[in-house]
Amino acid sequence: MQQLQNVIETAFERRADITPVNVDTVTREAVNQVISLLDSGALRVAEKIDGQWVTHQWLKKAVLLSFRINDNQVIDGAESRYFDKVPMKFADYDEARFQKEGFRVVPPAAVRQGAFIARNTVLMPSYVNIGAYVDEGTMVDTWATVGSCAQIGKNVHLSGGVGIGGVLEPLQANPTIIEDNCFIGARSEVVEGVIVEEGSVISMGVYLGQSTKIYDRETGEVHYGRVPAGSVVVSGNLPSKDGKYSLYCAVIVKKVDAKTRGKVGINELLRTID
């Protein structure tokens, strides 16, 4: 694996000079191998090691290089034709392969090659970009989007119209991460490498970026870029110091543990916030 990484790192340093016409065989094969490994889930752009999320920047570099080495090509779809550098993940799937991999794909859901979809996942008409990782038992609901290199955990529900941000550039940025057993409410947006920790419930229409204040009403603490595990979060506002205006924030209205969450429905958690 180190040799593969070295090839990618070296090629990335001269990426401005690489085109589909002049790319050397070693680089092309290395990039294609990485995309294949991302596609199968053997590699992932970010993973949790000793309780901390670690981003493998060289894998993001390989994804960016794939845009340098490939020309646009005609892509056939169920309703139309497309013209792009990245093939669709399911272009060569037959019924036997869908059965083997064990997920459902509802038309016109679109998944780019280089994204991993685990077993028992359901993709409603939605979009999953290259480098993303969608773990077991997750529902990606209608018109939800999973951005490039985003990491979605097990048993997550991304409700209708949810946007999970992609983050190939700037290269040093970390991917957006939704940990296991989270619920993201309809039309919410989680972007810019924000981490929603395990078992959290995000209400409808909550917007989370790195600069968003995430206010815990019980403790008065303000978080940035991270929703603590087991949080129930709704949209809110915080007043300015002079009291003349207020600015948008997200509010942690309560914390729940796995036992409580298992007994109480999502709707009840969100309705009883007083």
Swiss-Prot record:
It is an enzyme of class 2 (transferase). It comes from Salmonella schwarzengrund (strain CVM19633). One of its GO terms (molecular function) is nucleotidyltransferase activity. Belongs to the transferase hexapeptide repeat family. The keyword Iron-sulfur does not apply. GO terms for cellular component: cytoplasm. This is 2,3,4,5-tetrahydropyridine-2,6-dicarboxylate N-succinyltransferase. Its EC number is 2.3.1.117. InterPro entries: DapD_Trfase_Hexpep_rpt_fam, Hexapep, Hexapep_transf_CS, THP_succinylTrfase_dom1, THP_succinylTrfase_N_sf, Trimer_LpxA-like_sf.
